[in-house]
């Protein structure tokens, strides 16, 4: 009966804490998410979306302290480490996903064959609050069936997605829509591979002194 008095945000947090899958707003689009350490929930997300299992799931964090839960901060030999820190200082929180070495023992659905995971510090107040109250980073893949357009208005959420999750938090402010987050992989001092152009213009990266390598 106590659950009847829960706010929509409370329900989303409880679902995430209990290992469920949720839909929630981010600064770009609505996201489909779960705790990063729950392999079963991550597999559910892949199934709900019809997403290729070989495609890693991106992650958001609610504050910088949560970065250590998803990224291997001891990867001292990684040549992109200094550049990654500079990117974070310049552009986080914001719609910039940075590809980083994944922390050991996390589910394989999060990382690619090189052991890298895409992470961003979200500025969206509701997404941040869910991460902080659930005490974990969250998967943040777009809440759409694979191959379909992402949604910034929950009214257009696919029935397949809605039926497959444990909670939908509509939240305010609504996602901005437009473009997904920009994704970059730091490879050397002030040198980044642009994996996906997006909401943070690559020209902004260049103006801050980062050398850009476009992917083919």
For each of these PLM feature ranges, what is it?
Residues 1-216:
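Active-site-adjacent structural elements in enzyme catalytic cores
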């Amino acid at each position: 009966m106590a659950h009847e008095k829960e706010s929509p945000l409370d329900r989303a947090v409880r679902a995430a804490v209990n290992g469920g899958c949720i839909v929630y707003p981010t600064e770009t689009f609505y996201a489909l998410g779960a705790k990063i350490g729950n392999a079963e929930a991550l597999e559910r997300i892949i199934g709900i979306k019809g997403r290729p299992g070989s495609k890693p799931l991106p992650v958001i964090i609610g504050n910088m302290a949560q970065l250590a839960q998803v990224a291997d901060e001891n990867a001292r030999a990684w040549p992109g480490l200094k550049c990654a820190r500079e990117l974070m200082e310049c552009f986080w929180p914001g719609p910039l996903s940075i590809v980083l070495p994944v922390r050991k023992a996390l589910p394989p659905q999060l990382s690619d064959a090189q052991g890298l995971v895409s992470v961003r510090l979200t500025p969206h107040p509701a997404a941040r609050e869910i991460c902080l109250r659930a005490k974990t980073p969250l998967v943040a893949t777009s809440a759409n069936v694979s191959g379909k357009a992402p949604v910034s208005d929950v009214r257009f959420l696919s029935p397949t997605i809605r039926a497959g999750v444990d909670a939908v938090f509509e939240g305010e402010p609504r996602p901005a829509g437009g473009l997904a987050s920009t994704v970059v992989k730091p490879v050397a001092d002030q040198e980044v591979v642009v994996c996906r152009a997006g909401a943070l213009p690559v020209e902004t990266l260049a103006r801050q002194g980062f050398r850009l390598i476009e992917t083919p």
